[in-house]
Each structure stands twice: as C-alpha cells, then as structure tokens.
Regions:
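Conserved alpha/beta-domain cores
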Residues: 1-190
C-alpha cells in the first residue's frame, strides 16, 4: 500500500466519522525503516514523520531535513531524561510526556534553551504494566502540574491501545479526557 492509498483511507475514515480529512495529520512512522524508503515517502511529498528513538533520529533526519524543506519530526517513543537536550533540538513535537521527573527536566531544559516543542501526555488507558503512560486516574492532576508548576506547552494526549483490545473504547476515553482538560490534540496510534 502506497502513501496515496493510506491518505485515501484516512480521508474515508474521517468522512465516515463526520470529521474533516484536513483536520487529521498522518504521521509516517519511520523507525527502523531504511533511508531509501523514507526518502521515497519524502519524494512523494509527505513531510510529517515519527521516530521512536532519539539516537536513530539523530542518525537520519539532519540530512533529510537539509534535502527536504518543511519536514516536521515527532518523537513517539519513550524519552529518557538523558536524551532531553538532543530531543529538544531535533523534534518538532514530543508525544511521550509520561512522568513528573521528565516534565521537570523538560521544563528546565526548555527554559535554558528558550523554547519547547508542543507536548502530548501519554496516557496508559489499558493500565498495562509494561507500557509507559500516566494512569487515567492521575491524569488531571498531572496536567495541572505540567501547566501550573512547569509551564509546559501541552498540545494534547497520546495513547497506544492494548494490542488485544478493540481500540475504539481507548480512543473514545482519550478524547473525553482531552476535552475535559481543554486539550485539542489527540495522538492515537497503532
């Protein structure tokens, strides 16, 4: 399935859900993809990509950004506190804010840098012990701390539903949590 096919499916799903296709951003996940495949998608005109690891992104995206204007890069995977500085330099959006220690260190690094990309709070709606993310019961208080104590630019919420669950209930729950907290962005993957 090519990029045009994927974009057509996204547009059909948006229309079926009563949404505007233009309101949905497709993040092409480029983790572990060979550079030749990423380059082909860039040449096809797509500009929004996601990576799971800071180190992998550092190895491929500076050259792609030099060759292709308008690239927007999203960090989708866990962010270790020792990788905050390079993450802030490389990524346009971070989708994996999931704990107070990370929020505090992001705030400190962003203040020193003078800027912070938009952030999505990762929510563990399935309460899976092996997955990162804020427990839904702790979310509202965490968002308040991120706003009030750390002054972080929260853009929305992110979820990766459990593999064995139907995703719709997790997506619906995330949308309700985002609305309750005045967050417009929803990052719903896999």
């Amino acid at each position: 399935m090519g990029l045009d096919d994927v974009l057509a499916r996204v547009a059909q799903a948006a229309e079926a859900a009563g949404r505007e296709p233009a309101d949905i951003t497709l993040i092409a996940v480029s983790k572990v993809q060979p550079n030749v495949r990423v380059k082909a998608v860039l040449q096809a005109g797509h500009r929004v990509f996601g990576e799971n690891k800071v180190q992998e992104a550092q190895g491929k995206w500076p050259d792609f950004r030099a060759a292709f204007a308008g690239v927007e890069l999203h960090l989708l995977g866990p962010l270790q506190t020792n990788k905050i500085k390079p993450a802030l330099e490389l990524f346009d959006v971070i989708h994996s804010l999931d704990r107070d220690k990370l929020a505090r260190k992001l705030a400190d690094a962003a203040q020193a840098r003078g800027a912070c990309p938009p952030l999505f709070v990762q929510v563990n709606t399935g309460r899976e012990p092996q997955k990162a993310g804020i427990d839904p019961d702790d979310l509202d208080a965490f968002i308040a701390r991120c706003r009030d104590d750390y002054a972080l630019p929260l853009a929305g919420l992110m979820v990766i539903p459990p593999v064995d669950d139907a995703p719709r209930p997790h997506f619906d729950a995330l949308a309700e949590m985002a609305a309750r907290n005045g967050l417009a962005g929803l990052s719903m993957g896999m």
